[in-house]
Amino acid sequence: DLCIGRDDSAIKASNSGFSIFNFEIEVVPNITDLVEENILVEEGECVPEVRKLLRTISDVTSFNYQQYEIEHAPCDRNILVTAGAGTGKTYSMVSRIAFLCNKTADAVVDIVGDIAMITFTKDAAQNMKVRLKKMFMNYFILTSNEKYMHLIEDMSQIQISTIHKFAISLLQRDCMRMGLAYDSQVSSETYNRKELYHNYLNLFLSEKSEENPDFAQQMTLPTYRLEELLIEFCDKLYDRSIDIKKLSSKSFGEATSILPYFNELVDEVIIKAENDYAESLKASNLIGLRECMIQINDLVTSNKLMKQGHEYKYVFVDEFQDTDDIQIETITGLQHLFGEQCKLFIVGDLKQSIYRFRGASLSAFDKAIQVDGKDFWTFYSLNRNYRTDKRLLDKFHDVFTQMGLRSLIPYEEESDRLSSQIIKEYSDGNLICKMESHLKDKDAFYDDFFEKLESELNELNELCQKEKLSKEEKTIAILVRYNWHIRNIVKEAEKKGLLIKVTEGGDLY
């Protein structure tokens, strides 16, 4: 519930509001100019005049009407939320689930059977479970209602996982259709696969050498490197959920002059090795991790996935901009399989689409909407940033505006521009510091880099003496473009006695 009105009692609030657990009070300047009597808004239901009032209050306090609107969105429609970085999308998703569990009519009773959530990494899935558990714990402390203790217990069983793990959980329930036993397991083993590539490539090269004794001398790269490239090529297709076993060499067009026998390698090495590997997994009662999305998509599109036990009412998908075409097709197909009661809640930001090398595209939202049409969707946005200095956001806006004008990214100022009330202690000149150095002169580059890093560390230590900082505020992040940059920086840091913690992203399974 949300109440608006006057209270002349001696409530003391710092800044513009006060909060404890899930209870919040916002102090609205000159509220008597906005409202003449107390107003109660229950479960987000209110007339247009009150919605206008809520937007006004949102503009002058920390109350976020965008989040409130998403939390109480209609339950009979698909929801699409475009959420910029640091705008509280996780909070909004958690609040939405809380609303679904607490609303007066048709509330979620069986959270394990009614709600599923798909995240992009294992770390994100774990973070979501922790946030939900904490929220329900707060509810229990406030109300002493045993309902929330049961919800806390359900957190160990709720389906919150990466899309790969979600696909695997569905496949394991339906493994008999794939010729596997009920106790099938997932495998990410690669040794046997490499052995198959090695054997088929050696056989191919041997046959070529018999046809042409000079064939080995005419090869432009070592055999071991050719073997690695063939596996990498196949993996790139799997990353885009493309099953090479169903293709033929004709699908790849004319071979280049650099590797004129490439199409033969596809037929004689890659496809044969992958078919043998798939058969070996099946014989061992295993599901290949790389192929799980292809297998679940095949079952969904052919309408062969068993519906029994799959009756989710709400499916949440985080970081939707990073899904590829097959994943989108699978998610929307699963929604129809789960039944008419199932509604999607997808969240993402096309500006953060960084997995296009895996098949993600800037049209991810459009492709999801096109399945049933716009009439089945309600659209929301989040653009109040809680993380970044306002001055930086203004600079980013200038960059995004130019990218939008060039059609590099979709960007509309009204809906996409991020706002913030945060002003850090840095001067305007120190918000972005440019260090000019040429990577070809490695010694000079690393000297300059670590000199700057030590300078920032000293400033951070001085700041820690003046005020208490969180773990995140005391952390310096180093972002690189390639993984080999990480190894080089860590190696140079060790020489200088600096410890750098390496994080290369969360696992997909």
Please place each PLM-identified region on the residue numbering.
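Accessory nucleic-acid engagement/destabilization modules that flank
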Residues: 1-35, 143, 156-162, 199-207
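Conserved motor-region signature of P-loop NTPase helicases/translocases
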Residues: 2-5, 17, 21-130, 134, ...
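A ubiquitous short alpha-helical element
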Residues: 80-82, 116, 186, 257-265, ...
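Short coil/turn segments at secondary-structure boundaries
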Residues: 85, 182-184, 213-220, 243-253, ...
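Conserved P-loop NTPase-based nucleic-acid remodeling module centered on helicase motor cores
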Residues: 113-219, 363-367, 394
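Core structural elements
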Residues: 158-168, 222-239, 296, 478-488
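Conserved helicase/translocase P-loop NTPase motor core
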Residues: 164-167, 193-197, 266-314, 326-330, ...
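Coupling/switch/interface segments within P-loop NTPase motor domains and analogous charged loops
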Residues: 193-280
